Every structure is written in structure tokens, then in C-alpha cells.
Amino acid sequence: MKKNSLRRLIALVVLALAGTPAFAAPALISNPNVAAEKIDAATLKAVFLGKKVAWDGAGRVTLAVLKGGPVAEEFLKGTVDMSASAFGNHWRRLAMTGGGTAPKSFEKDEDLRKFVAETPGAIGFVDSALADASVAVLTPAP
């Protein structure tokens, strides 16, 4: 009886772990017309906090973000030192005071990648496994 219970427990643990979604590190992506292979940390933070609204020579910045999830949490924590909910609150505050337009937000990485690929001046982040040739992958510099 104990052997069967142990086998069931092991089987449940294996199934639970198999169902856990894995993700790669976030990748910073932009529309190919954004002429910057590297972007420094201060500029990147200014872009995602709405302080930099135009690219040098490439028009207006269009920000695209994931609504939540591990990729969003990791990227936002590393870039602007905020959780996804704090980041959302920051943008709601800016929008209510007339200080900016909230970023376009997406549930799925694939939808965000497609939006960035098709929108001049767009920048966002996706699971690095989903970054493809339709977008430019930027390297944040320290």
C-alpha cells in the first residue's frame, strides 16, 4: 500500500513539474527602423518610464508591454526596478495627469512581437525564444 502511495506521489510531482511553463530570458526588441543595436540602461529606463518620447532620428517612441507573467516581471524588475503592477500604476498616474499615454499592452508575446514589427518606432520585450528576424533585438548596455 505504501509503495503505491509513493508511486502516485512521484507521478503527481512529475506531472506538476511537466506542466510548469518554462521561459527564456526576456529579449528587448524594436521595430527595425529604430537605429540602435545597443541602448544604455539610463535611456532604456527613460523610455519605459515615459521620459524619453522620441528616438534620435527615428520618430516617436511607441511602447509595447506584456500585461504580466514571468517575462514581464523579470524585464521590468531589471529595467525600471518595478513589479508589473507598480509599472502599471506608474503609467495610470501619468495618463491621469496628462503626462503620457499608457503603453500598448498585450497578453501574448506573439501579439506584442507582431505589433512591434509592424509599428515604426515601437519597442518592447518578449520571451527571447520568440524574437525573430521580423524585429531588431537590442542589447542593453550597462
Stretches found by the model and what they are:
Residues A18-A25:
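Sec/Tat signal peptide C-region and signal peptidase I cleavage site
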Residues K2-A11:
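Bacterial N-terminal signal peptides that target proteins for export
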Residues A25-P142:
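Exported/periplasmic ABC-transporter solute-binding proteins
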